[in-house]
Amino acid sequence: MDSDMSGGMVKVMVPASTANLGPGFDVLGVALNLYTEISMEFIKDGLEIFVEGEGVEDIENDQNNLIYKSAEVIFKKIGVFNKGLRIKIKNEIPLGRGLGSSAAAIVGGLLAANELTGRVLKREEILNLAALIEGHADNVTAALNGGLNVSIFDKNKVYYARKALEDDIDFLAFVPQEMVRTEIARKVLPEKVDFNDAVFNTGRTAFLVSVLIEKKYELLKIATQDMLHQKYRAKLVPFMEECFEKALLAGAYAAFLSGAGPTIMAISSPENSERVLKEVGKVYEERGLSYRAYRLKCENNGAQVLKTPSFV
């Protein structure tokens, strides 16, 4: 397949996400209203990548760029060759902080490339490819679908259930200056876990989903408890437990590591959010640590196509 696909530019917008939510390791994900916006179009030859916003110094502008590499998966799959490509990225999602920046890049690259080549693949196929590239399904499923997602990745296929969340809770993200790559955060995890710890997390993961759906937010504190990963990752975020404690004392419903960290995420009622932001912020300030705090909502729309080429 070649030419005849110069009908213009495609633009997509993909949300950030928080995964695990405590006990739901590699299973739970919630989309959040921070975004990566990607414009993509074919050009005569070469590769041009322009980056604005978060990570401008860290996002590659060559063939190692994750958005480009994801787009290439689509092009090779459907047989598009000998095309130059221009990609423009406007990014709001902090990199390497546990907020799904790589998932947004992967989903965005796949979705944009699919639109650019005539929408050959269904969104379900895009999701399966995204999970294959990412290696797990929690963030990419949330990024593509929006809302709260429970997902499993089995034999290269994603199975999921999704539920939109209302805006009566805030997701408060405390993002430190230092990043922790997911591969580093996974290396500190044990190869085997205690059977009782597995049972502990299984029960709380199921309970957490029910609590969010039924809006029994006062039960989130116990529902978000974890025994499988956070205690091992504490060495990478040494003030983690203190942040959790301060958040709960300030009135948050729950606090946990966002994904692999190092971002600390708290869930709060809008009425308590400012107090939680202030009290947890003190943990960073007292240590002289730079951080940013975001007051976010669940993004229920998921990845969106903002502009479609004329031939689609």
UniProtKB/Swiss-Prot annotation:
It catalyses: L-homoserine + ATP = O-phospho-L-homoserine + ADP + H(+). One of its GO terms (molecular function) is ATP binding. It is found in: Cytoplasm. One of its GO terms (biological process) is threonine biosynthetic process. The keyword Kinase applies. GO terms for cellular component: cytoplasm. Coiled coil: none annotated. It is an enzyme of class 2 (transferase). PROSITE patterns: GHMP_KINASES_ATP (PS00627). It comes from the Bacteria. Keywords: Amino-acid biosynthesis, ATP-binding, Cytoplasm, Kinase, Nucleotide-binding, Threonine biosynthesis, Transferase. SUPFAM superfamilies: GHMP Kinase, C-terminal domain, Ribosomal protein S5 domain 2-like. Its main location: cytoplasm. Its EC number is 2.7.1.39. Pathway: Amino-acid biosynthesis; L-threonine biosynthesis; L-threonine from L-aspartate: step 4/5. ATP binds at P94, L95, G96, R97, G98, L99, G100, S101, S102, A103, A104. InterPro entries: GHMP_kinase_C_dom, GHMP_kinase_C_sf, GHMP_kinase_N_dom, GHMP_knse_ATP-bd_CS, Homoserine_kinase, Ribosomal_Su5_D2-typ_SF, Ribsml_uS5_D2-typ_fold_subgr. Belongs to the GHMP kinase family. Homoserine kinase subfamily. HAMAP family: Homoser_kinase (MF_00384). PANTHER family: HOMOSERINE KINASE, HOMOSERINE/4-DIPHOSPHOCYTIDYL-2-C-METHYL-D-ERYTHRITOL KINASE. Catalyzes the ATP-dependent phosphorylation of L-homoserine to L-homoserine phosphate. This is Homoserine kinase. The lineage of its organism: Bacteria, Bacillati, Bacillota, Clostridia, Thermoanaerobacterales. The gene is thrB.
